[in-house]
Structure formats: structure tokens, C-alpha cells
């Protein structure tokens, strides 16, 4: 449906994005509310019938949450079980022993990439930051040297590597092959994480000195005695940490199932029972559900947790993700209004007329929305709806898997004050706003630009 005409629709889109930035950054209005308000206003000024504006927004919101809410919920449960059982600590300590103290920043990057696969950035950060505090104290290293590689690994996984929920959303929107996307994501993501993580951390930790006293760190470092959650004794829990092998298997089980599912047609004839079974268990929802159920045994029952404790863990972990889930859904609603108002079509026409590469366009749109909303996931959600028609209609055809990477790279650019992650890192690291810009914001921009560059390089050879 087109409700407006001509180039004025492009002007409305620019004004809408500017209004998003103004309301979120200057007037501190919550992004969920801003996305709804701006979506409705955009529908009105673009000429959409009033009766269809709300329906359009609800359709986009529902289509987005219909998939992402399940992935987010299951991924968060898996991360919670791993944290409560000590699985994350097991992964960290094992890799630290293998890498050694001199290479601790490399170990933290690897830990973050592994742990971050099934969970959102904020969840992975909260799970791993206690480990970073303890590692920094034990090795007498700067928290920046230990922590920045960790957040770089989490960020790269967030935007570039399925089965992370944000990347999975882009895979779905572009109809990309998940197996190829994972492979390409690793090719682009690992070098990017190395540069933005350990190498950048080595440089910036020499230039920026954090205060010696950190109240949040003291809380985690001072929890050696007493009882843990649900009356569990910390020392007893530590003696019963899951093995490295079983922890790694449980965390990577969704990836394994999705990869095997993508090979179904190569192994079995289509529409046969074995083929259908592989595809069924390779579905992201089913793969994550399977991993969560397995974690109830590997991270739960085998660690001595009761059924009531496991159920409590699952309930506790869902409350913190409610806000980001609503924002993601609203981003999908905003993207649908852009489409139904005819703005997406005008953007397609404009981009086609200037012969912009679909990869560059996907990166640019996601980057603009990221700067406006502060959410990498919202940026990917909205940008995919805009860019997908260009990929289909443009003269230059590119692999949909590369579009996922380009859009994901754009969604990670320059985190600033409208991003919850910005404040999360500022407070936990004990930094000033200026220091957070020089570290976290710059790190995110390095990931974004290098991710785009490597995606273009990969496009030249695949």
C-alpha cells in the first residue's frame, strides 16, 4: 500500500529519524514510546488512512515478536542456567589456564564469543562481568585490558554470528542460508573481534587509567562467604562446577543443530522423514528449546539444583529482557509503517537511481537507525525491512548471507548515550562519560567499519 507520493516521503523519513534522535537523546523519552509515537505520526503525515496506521504498526510488531520473543526467552534461560551452574566460570578458568596470564585478554574474547552465542549483549555482559572483575584482580591487569575484549566478543556475536537472536532475525528477513551465514560470520567476525578487542584493549588500557576503587567490582569480589542464591553454598557450588566439555557441548548445541539442519537436503532427499526431522530440530526455536531442556540436566539436576530452583531461575531471567523485547517489537512496527506508507519504495527507487551497493546501503540504513534508537537489534530489525526490497529489485545482486553481515555491521556503529549498553559499561567499568566514548563507543565503531570492509572483501571471492 502506498499512502504518499514523490520525494516528500523521503523528507518525512528523514524528519522521523531526526525526531527519534531528538526525543531519545535530548528529552530522554523511552525508546519504546518514541518508536510508537513517531510511527503513528509518520503514518499520518505520509497520508496513510487512519484506520490502517495502527494495524500496520501492530502487524510489524507482531511479525517481529512472533519469532524473536521465543529466541530471546529461550536464549536467556540457557544463559541463566549456565551462570547459576558455574558453567560460564568453568569455560573462563579453563581457557585462562590454557592461554596464561599474559594472554588473558585473548581468553576473555574467546569466552565472550562462546557465551554470547545464545544471549543478548546485555545478558551476556551481566553473566561475564563478575568473571572479568575476578580475573582482573587475580592477574593484576587493568579492567579495560580484560573487559574490552570481552565486550568486543559479545558485540561481534550480537551483530554477525547466528544463532544470536539479532543475527537470526536478519537471516529470516533476507531468507539467507543459516549455515553459510554462520560460516561467513565467523570469517568476518573473528578478525574483527581480534582487532576491536585484544589489540585495541592493549593500546587504550595504556592511555586510560581507571580508578582503583570500583564499588560494583567490590560487591562481586566480596562475595566469598555466606550463602548464594536459594541457600546454595558458594564453596559447594564451586566444587561441583560442570566440566568444560559438557559446558561447551550444551552452549554450542543450538549451533550444532542449526548447522545440521541446514545440511538436510545434502544428506537426505527432500520431503522424507529424516530430512523433515533434521529441518525440524534445526529450526532456531526448536534448537534453542532442545538446548534449554538439556541444560536443565547438565547445568541443573547434575549440579544438585532442585526442580523448584530451576523453575525459579527461568522465571527470574525473563523480567530483565522485557524492555528490550518491547523495543525490538516497536522497531518492527516502525519498519512496517515505513513500508506501508510507501517510503521504503521511494528509498528503493532513490538507492537504485544512484547505483548504491546493496551491501553499503544495508550498512548505512542500519547505522542511521542505530544512532537514532541506540539499539543494535532494532537497527537490524528495521533496516532489514527497508533493504530487503533493494536486494530483490537492484541491478547488482549479492548473497543474502552477506547482506546479513553488512546490516549487522551497520547496526553496531558508535554506541552513545541513547544506548543502554553505553551506561551499563560506564557504570560497571567505573568510567566517566568521556572515557566511555573513547573506549566503548570507539570499539563499536571499529567493529562496524571493519565488519563492512571484510564483508566487501568476502563478496569479491564468494
Language model segments and positions:
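Hydrophobic transmembrane alpha-helices of multi-pass solute/ion transporters
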Residues: 2-77, 90-94, 98, 257-330, ...
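Long, contiguous bundles of hydrophobic transmembrane helices that form the permeation core
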Residues: 2-7, 183-312
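Membrane-interfacial loop-to-helix junctions in multi-pass transporters
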Residues: 7-11, 50, 62-68, 95-110, ...
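Hydrophobic core segments of alpha-helical transmembrane domains in multi-pass membrane transport
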Residues: 12-24, 36-44, 72-77, 112-115, ...
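Short helix-coil transition sites and intra-membrane helix breaks within transmembrane domains
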Residues: 27-31, 65-68, 79-89, 115-130, ...
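Juxtamembrane helix-boundary/capping and inter-helix hinge elements in multi-pass membrane proteins
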Residues: 46, 83-88, 98-102, 135-146, ...
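Hydrophobic transmembrane alpha-helices that form the pore/transport pathway of multi-pass ion
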Residues: 96-184, 372-409
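C-terminal transmembrane helix pair
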Residues: 99-102, 189, 358-462
Amino acid at each position: 500500500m502506498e499512502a504518499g507520493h514523490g520525494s516528500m516521503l523521503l523528507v518525512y523519513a528523514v524528519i522521523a529519524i531526526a525526531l527519534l534522535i531528538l526525543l531519545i537523546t535530548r528529552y530522554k523519552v523511552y525508546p519504546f514510546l518514541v518508536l510508537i509515537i513517531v510511527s503513528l505520526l509518520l503514518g499520518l503525515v505520509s497520508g496513510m488512512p487512519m484506520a490502517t496506521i495502527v494495524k500496520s504498526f501492530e502487524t510489524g510488531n507482531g511479525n517481529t515478536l512472533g519469532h524473536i520473543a521465543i529466541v530471546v526467552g529461550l536464549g536467556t534461560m540457557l544463559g541463566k542456567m549456565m551462570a547459576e551452574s558455574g558453567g560460564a566460570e568453568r569455560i573462563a578458568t579453563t581457557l585462562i589456564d590454557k592461554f596464561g596470564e599474559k594472554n588473558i585478554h585473548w581468553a576473555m574474547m574467546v569466552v565472550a564469543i562462546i557465551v554470547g552465542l545464545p544471549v543478548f549483549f546485555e545478558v551476556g555482559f551481566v553473566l561475564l562481568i563478575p568473571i572479568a572483575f575476578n580475573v582482573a584482580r587475580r592477574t593484576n591487569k587493568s579492567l579495560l585490558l580484560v573487559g574490552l575484549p570481552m565486550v568486543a566478543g559479545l558485540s561481534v556475536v550480537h551483530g554477525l554470528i547466528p544463532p544470536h537472536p539479532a543475527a537470526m532475525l536478519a537471516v529470516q528477513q533476507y531468507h539467507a542460508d543459516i549455515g553459510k551465514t554462520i560460516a561467513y560470520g565467523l570469517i568476518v567476525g573473528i578478525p574483527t573481534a581480534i582487532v576491536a578487542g585484544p589489540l585495541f584493549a592493549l593500546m587504550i588500557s595504556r592511555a586510560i587509567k581507571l580508578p582503583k576503587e570500583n564499588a560494583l567490582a567490590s560487591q562481586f569480589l566480596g562475595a566469598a562467604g555466606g550463602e548464594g542464591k536459594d541457600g546454595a553454598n558458594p564453596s559447594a557450588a564451586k566444587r561441583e562446577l560442570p566440566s568444560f566439555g559438557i559446558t561447551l557441548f550444551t552452549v554450542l548445541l543450538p549451533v550444532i543443530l542449526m548447522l545440521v539442519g541446514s545440511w538436510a537436503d545434502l544428506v537426505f532427499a527432500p520431503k522424507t522423514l529424516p530430512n523433515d526431522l533434521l529441518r525440524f530440530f534445526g529450526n532456531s526455536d526448536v534448537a534453542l528449546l532442545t538446548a534449554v531442556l538439556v541444560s536443565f540436566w547438565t547445568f541443573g539436576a547434575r549440579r544438585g539444583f532442585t526442580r523448584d530452583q530451576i523453575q525459579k531461575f527461568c522465571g527470574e531471567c525473563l523480567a530483565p529482557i522485557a524492555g528490550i523485547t518491547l523495543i525490538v517489537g516497536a522497531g518492527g512496527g516502525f519498519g512496517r509503517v515505513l513500508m506501508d506508507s510507501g517510503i521504503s519504495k521511494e528509498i528503493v527507487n532513490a538507492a537504485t537511481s544512484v547505483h548504491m551497493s546493496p551491501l553499503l546501503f544495508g550498512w548505512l540504513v542500519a547505522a542511521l537507525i542505530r544512532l537514532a534508537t541506540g539499539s543494535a537489534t532494532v537497527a537490524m530489525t528495521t533496516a532489514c525491512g527497508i533493504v530487503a526490497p533493494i536486494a530483490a529489485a537492484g541491478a547488482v545482486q549479492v548473497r543474502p548471507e552477506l547482506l546479513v553481515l553488512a546490516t549487522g555491521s551497520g547496526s553496531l556503529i558508535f554506541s552513545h548515550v541513547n544506548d543502554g549498553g553505553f551506561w551499563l559499561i560506564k557504570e560497571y567499568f567505573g568510567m566517566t562519560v568521556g572515557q566511555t566514548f573513547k573506549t566503548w563507543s570507539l570499539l563499536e565503531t571499529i567493529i562496524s567499519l571493519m565488519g563492512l570492509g571484510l564483508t566487501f572483501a568476502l563478496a569479491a571471492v564468494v
